[in-house]
Amino acid sequence: MTALPQRTLMVMAGGTGGHVFPGLAVAHLMQAWGWKVVWLGNPAGMEATLVPKHGIPMEYVRFGGLRGKGMKTKLMLPVNLLRACTQSLSVLRRVKPDVVLGMGGYITFPAGLMTALSGRPLVLHEQNSIAGLANKVLAKVAKRVLVAFPNALPHGEWTGNPIREELARAIAPKARYAQRSGPLNVLVVGGSLGAAALNEVVPRAVALLAPNERPRIVHQAGAKHIEALRENYSAAGLQAGADVELVPFIDDMTSAYANADLVICRSGAMTVSEISAVGVAAFFVPFPYAVDDHQTTNAAFLADNGAALVVQQRDLSAETLADWLRSQTRETLAEMAERSRSLAKPDATEQVAQICATVAGSISGASPEGKQ
């Protein structure tokens, strides 16, 4: 019997982890199904360093955004866009992908346009609750439009965000919370850049609580901010120890989420999706300068369903947080966690991969050997 030719997926994604990591989740699954995967990114983006470490070959297109740039960059847009389109077309002719998956980042725009104009099928995935201009345009020429949050794009199919497999396999919240006793376990996530508002307010809020009201804290703040965070806790009369753990990084986020009764954090798209997948109560403080304020609408997806609380940074204070923590019990947080888990899309990675396979003309992609 003649073996079927190996099919090729090209992933277009770059710029931030919110675009790259969900793309990697789909890429690895497609590889497990026997597909060849090629990644199109920007040589100056994080993907240029990260993706090759995952054994995925790279192709490059140079293209950047206009937000915050000077007049010279804006005047050069037509030239830069034309160059990026030419580079994208060259890559498409060389790679000959059976399907192209656009996961976001500036390079997705010229490469997505050239994908559609060259007659190759484009699958578009929007990770945020509010789509950017590029995806709004590309959605008009894509074969399938997928969204992580309902109604992010017209006619978008709600798949959720592709996440790491271990997050989707976390033990159900009801079982986790029922096994615990004693002080609440609170995880504070500032991210690699640190979230100054959280680093300043959380220590003061905990200090306002009576000793018997204080939760156990695991506070992640990024390597550059860990000493300042230590000083913040010290100034609040709290020392790092058994009940206050300060860490620059967390390698195993699945365990960190699963061990927490409550997560206090920003509300980037992947953070919201991961918290929902694991099923844990959340206190969101959206980044106030996010494009189109998309972090607020990301968080609202869970908050509107009783799975989280959203407090804007301008309204956040030690007193507000302390009062809210006093009002919570492990039982109330467990209820929030259950609601959060019920909104998750744990099969998002497989669903996105299956759609790519279908668009490429496969009967079924769900085969580790890639047999159709």
Curated annotation (Swiss-Prot):
Q: What is its main location?
A: membrane
State the protein's name.
UDP-N-acetylglucosamine--N-acetylmuramyl-(pentapeptide) pyrophosphoryl-undecaprenol N-acetylglucosamine transferase
Q: Give the species this sequence originates from.
A: Paraburkholderia phytofirmans (strain DSM 17436 / LMG 22146 / PsJN)
A single GO BP term for this record reads: cell wall organization
Gene3D superfamilies given in the database record: Glycogen Phosphorylase B
Q: Which gene encodes it?
A: murG
Physiological role: Cell wall formation. Catalyzes the transfer of a GlcNAc subunit on undecaprenyl-pyrophosphoryl-MurNAc-pentapeptide (lipid intermediate I) to form undecaprenyl-pyrophosphoryl-MurNAc-(pentapeptide)GlcNAc (lipid intermediate II).
Instruction: Please report the record's description of how this protein sits within the membrane.
Output: Peripheral membrane protein
Record EC number: 2.4.1.227
Pathway of this protein? Cell wall biogenesis; peptidoglycan biosynthesis
Family membership: Belongs to the glycosyltransferase 28 family. MurG subfamily.
Q: Which reaction equation describes what this protein catalyses?
A: di-trans,octa-cis-undecaprenyl diphospho-N-acetyl-alpha-D-muramoyl-L-alanyl-D-glutamyl-meso-2,6-diaminopimeloyl-D-alanyl-D-alanine + UDP-N-acetyl-alpha-D-glucosamine = di-trans,octa-cis-undecaprenyl diphospho-[N-acetyl-alpha-D-glucosaminyl-(1->4)]-N-acetyl-alpha-D-muramoyl-L-alanyl-D-glutamyl-meso-2,6-diaminopimeloyl-D-alanyl-D-alanine + UDP + H(+)
Top-rank EC class of the record's enzyme: transferase
User: What InterPro entries does this protein map onto?
Assistant: GlcNAc_MurG, Glyco_trans_28_C, GlycoTrans_28_N
Q: Which UniProt keywords apply?
A: Cell cycle, Cell division, Cell inner membrane, Cell membrane, Cell shape, Cell wall biogenesis/degradation, Glycosyltransferase, Membrane, Peptidoglycan synthesis, Transferase
Q: Where does the UniProt annotation locate this protein? A: Cell inner membrane
Q: Which residues bind UDP-N-acetyl-alpha-D-glucosamine?
A: T16, G17, G18, N128, R164, S192, I250, Q295
Q: Name one GO molecular function term.
A: UDP-N-acetyl-D-glucosamine:N-acetylmuramoyl-L-alanyl-D-glutamyl-meso-2,6-diaminopimelyl-D-alanyl-D-alanine-diphosphoundecaprenol 4-beta-N-acetylglucosaminlytransferase activity
Which HAMAP family does its entry note? Answer: MurG (MF_00033)
Listed GO cellular component terms? plasma membrane
